[in-house]
From Swiss-Prot:
Molecular function GO labels: sterol binding
Xref: Pfam families: Oxysterol_BP (PF01237)
Residues of the signal peptide: none
Assigned protein family: Belongs to the OSBP family.
Gene giving rise to this polypeptide: osbJ
GO CC, alphabetical: cytosol; membrane
Name the UniProt record assigns to this protein: Oxysterol-binding protein 10
Top-level taxon of origin: Eukaryota
Amino acid sequence: MTDISDESNIGYEEEVEEEIMEDDLDINNDGCDGEDKKKNSGFLKQFASKQPFYKMSLPISYSEPRSFLEKLSDQGSFLDILLKVKNIENEDDRFLEILKFYLSGWIQQKIAKSPFNPVIGETYQCKWVHKDGSTTEYIAEQISHHPPSSSFCMHNQQNGVIFHSHLSPTSKFWGNSLENSMEGKLVYEIPSLQEEYIVEAPKIIVKGVLVGSLSTETVGSTNLTCKKTGYSAEIEFKGKGLFKSKHSLLVKVKHPSSKKALYTLEGKFDGTVSITSTKTGKTTAFFDINSDQIQPITSPLHELEENNSRVVWKHVIENLLNNNEDEASKQKTIVEENQRNLAKTREGKPWIPKNFIKVDNDDNEDSANQNNVYYYSKLIEIRKEIMKNN
């Protein structure tokens, strides 16, 4: 997609090349202590071996104390936005609310560290209890470990909405930065209206991996579309870059009935987004990432199955939270060794997920399912219940 801003479009690779020139990847500079130098040196040796990036192991100090499956549940931090869309009669306003919910999950990444790569068969469940008495349930499962791929489904039957995806994270190493991409589609459904909104995830750039301070930026272009209503949004996430971009986000909302965009949106690096109607020229506040977020509820450890993320990574998480990185690293190695040993016992046998079903696109006319290689085994049942009660 072409650049929708008025600013020059500088490729991220060019910015990283400049960053490498500035830092020279010197792990012996004053920005690293002795222990960090040792850890960074070990990581560089892995990189020099030319093995696939997903098989490399980042130093434990770069780990966020939770699994990627749990991190994906952050998409539900502003669920109140999604829960009201079914009752919005105007297609225009309904599309804007779906757009707002999507942006709420990506507009500002506050944690620069990397979550654990889930082991195959790992699961994570949580729920949100809302003021209207309804409950949103979330379930995720690791479908594959090498290469990694994860599926999740978030649904609220009382309010008639479903959000699901199958994602395959990939990473590239650019000198002092990591570029994290997620192949796959995010699908938002309103079954009672037979509407599906489909979009891809942006890229997350982690800077300062080897030297300097860790920081994250959301970058990349994508399109949010609703085939039934015809609405679409061209979305461009912009990092600050070398030229200190004014906007973190630029969006154009379009419809076939109009030759020009109906709305334009601009995001700032403080987490606020404004919207301008091209018809009236009026600009208003659209979203603020600093508003209250909804915290999910997770069952106590003793109630969880052994393949739940909180159980699998229990000892790693505990030691990271207690700043015991050496022991955390040892416990992480134990988890990974167990994973390798189990893989050997399954050699030649395909892994069959417990909660998600693989889609045969040749025989399946359901577009929402076709956009995800794996979908939640109860998805069709949930749709039927929503159609029945809404």
